[in-house]
UniProtKB/Swiss-Prot annotation:
Gene3D superfamilies: 3.90.950.10. Its EC number is 3.6.1.9. Its cofactor is a divalent metal cation. The keyword Hydrolase applies. PANTHER family: BIFUNCTIONAL DTTP/UTP PYROPHOSPHATASE/METHYLTRANSFERASE PROTEIN-RELATED (PTHR43213), BIFUNCTIONAL DTTP_UTP PYROPHOSPHATASE_METHYLTRANSFERASE PROTEIN-RELATED (PTHR43213:SF5). The active site is at D76 (proton acceptor). Keywords: Cytoplasm, Hydrolase, Nucleotide metabolism. CDD domains: Maf. This is Nucleoside triphosphate pyrophosphatase. Belongs to the Maf family. It catalyses: a ribonucleoside 5'-triphosphate + H2O = a ribonucleoside 5'-phosphate + diphosphate + H(+); a 2'-deoxyribonucleoside 5'-triphosphate + H2O = a 2'-deoxyribonucleoside 5'-phosphate + diphosphate + H(+). One of its GO terms (cellular component) is cytoplasm.
């Protein structure tokens, strides 16, 4: 088995987390139709947890098909707000509407990671975190979206907790890493047990 991994994600924050943890990896972005997969799963009544897990597996499987002997890490994150999955905002107005809907309320982020090797899944984990958004004013939310659009357009829920988005919240119950989109503690434990990283 290889001593490095392929990250089947173009996420800068996931790459940064792995790099800072000293993991030897390279990026090989998976080209999958996430919207089609998500729509089909929602139509079948799949849970948000299962949707996150299936999307992460689809990415790992896709890249593993090209590099079967490599260890491939696929990841995905979904946001469950009152039974509805929120996606990355399509424009500033949608970002603002998402934030206004969530203020003063609780939502859940589910971060899935799946490792594939030899065309089969070896490990998987779905971490979850519950967040409560503060009652921010319309004026603040409008200026927040305007200031941060280039960054938050790539984030489910239209915020990044590692940036100014931290000001939007009153409570976070769960791992900060799951908010960032990668269950790092569980992943590091698995990679250590497999001899991929030193323990």
């Amino acid at each position: 088995m290889s001593t490095h991994i392929l990250l089947a994600s173009g996420s800068e924050i996931r790459a940064k987390l792995l790099r800072q943890a000293g993991v030897d990896f390279r990026v090989e972005v998976a080209r999958v139709d996430e919207d089609a997969i998500k729509t089909a799963l929602e139509a079948d009544g799949a849970s948000p947890r299962d949707i996150a897990d299936t999307l992460a597996e689809a990415k790992a499987r896709k890249v593993s098909g090209k590099f079967p002997e490599e260890m491939v890490l696929g990841c995905d994150q979904v946001l469950d707000f009152e039974g509805t999955l929120l996606s990355k905002p399509k424009d500033k107005n949608q970002a603002l509407q998402q934030l206004k809907a969530m203020r003063g309320k609780r939502h859940m982020l589910l971060s899935a990671a799946v490792i594939y090797c030899d065309a089969k899944p070896l490990w998987r984990h779905v971490g979850q975190v519950r967040l409560v958004m503060r009652m921010a004013s319309d004026a603040y939310l409008e200026s927040y979206v305007e200031r941060n659009w280039e960054s938050i357009r790539h984030a489910v829920g239209a915020y990044k907790l590692e940036e100014e988005g931290v000001r939007l919240f009153t409570t976070i119950d769960g791992s900060y890493f799951n908010v960032l989109g990668l269950p790092m503690l569980e992943l590091m434990n698995y990679l250590g047990l497999q001899g991929i990283i030193e323990q």
